[in-house]
A protein has these predicted regions:
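Active-site C-terminal subdomain of aminotransferase-like
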Residues: 73-74, 246-312
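Conserved beta-loop-alpha segment that forms the PLP phosphate-binding cup at the N-terminus of a helix
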Residues: 111-141, 145, 149-153
Length: 312
């Protein structure tokens, strides 16, 4: 697609000698003897892009495959919901839809309470941090082994939380004995970490970490943005879990989701938009939300009625 979009006339490669047959099949032609060293030989080859290249033509017609963690490809029934007529978030229809969606989320996450806010997953994490601050849980330990763990450190500090950072190399596992020692010696109110560190593709050992944290009576908050929907997991022993509509739930980004297993406190000195307690106590929807986003998420969640979604 890159070649076609930029209308190039010719392409050059240094092809590995092991794949010369494949290169010729695609249409590449050798134009020089091998280069490099005896241990690492390469074939100078070119591809005439003005010729009638059957392979390139076939590639141009091929469907693009999306391997991003988000945004993701949508199922046809989810796409269909995005074409529906918008209706009021104050309507009985929308209230009923939201309640049904929350019920599905609570079952999938295995949490007592689910809350939906209009925003990205970052908003979900920020709302959790506002709860921590509002509860007087000011001292925390943030675990990081990738880009999004590092982001949690920055976010918690912006919420004026006093945090230490247990940081290991990108993609490395946390030393559980060292974590236990840090929590025993420190005066921590909460621990915050990423379940699946998207930047390096490592699924952290949340079971073991949870056991250590809860044995100390410490509150546990988890960024599960790219693990929820991709990995079957019960968050019943986690106090707060953040996720969104736009990753492995396979809907459209735009709805921030917080699962909680503890009482949500009222935050009188926090921006209303971050107040999970306020969002939950309302008998109607507190802020404007596009009905099509809720329709799409509700439909996407139907794929999780059985465990087949995780096996395929």
């Amino acid at each position: 697609n890159y070649i076609i979009q930029n209308a190039y006339d010719i392409a050059f490669i240094s092809g590995t000698t092991r794949q010369e047959k494949l290169y010729k099949h695609i249409g590449f032609t050798r134009f020089h003897e091998n280069v490099g060293t005896k241990d690492a030989e390469y074939i100078p080859m070119y591809l005439d892009l003005n010729s009638d290249n059957k392979v390139l033509n076939r590639l141009a017609r091929a469907k693009r495959i999306n391997f991003l963690p988000g945004p993701v490809d949508l199922a046809d029934d989810v796409k269909e919901k995005l074409t529906k007529q918008l209706y009021s978030h104050r309507s009985n229809e929308f209230v009923s839809l939201t309640k049904d969606t929350l019920s599905k989320l609570e079952r999938i996450l295995d949490v007592k309470t689910a809350t939906i806010l209009h925003g990205s997953a970052t908003l979900a994490n920020e709302a959790i941090m506002a709860q921590l601050k509002g509860r007087g849980l000011n001292n925390g330990l943030v675990l990081s082994n990738g880009e999004f763990g590092n982001r949690l450190v920055k976010e918690t500090k912006r919420h004026n939380l006093n945090v230490d950072n247990y940081q290991v190399g990108f993609g490395e596992s946390f030393d559980l004995e060292l974590l236990d020692k840090k929590l025993s010696e420190g005066n921590y109110d909460f621990v915050y970490l990423v379940h699946n560190e998207t930047s390096v593709g490592i699924l952290n050992d949340l079971d073991s970490i949870t056991k250590i944290v809860k044995s100390k009576g410490i509150v546990l908050a988890v960024d599960a943005v790219s693990s929820v929907g991709a990995v079957k997991y019960s968050y019943r022993n986690v106090d707060y879990v953040a996720c969104s509509s736009g990753k492995a739930f396979c809907s459209v980004a735009g709805l921030a989701i917080v699962g909680s297993n503890c009482e949500l406190v009222s935050l009188e000195h926090t921006p209303l938009y971050l107040d999970l307690h306020y969002a939950n106590k309302m008998t109607s929807i507190p802020f404007t939300q596009p009905s099509i986003l809720m329709e799409a998420l509700n439909t996407a969640l139907d794929a999780f009625k059985t465990d087949d979604r995780y096996e395929n």
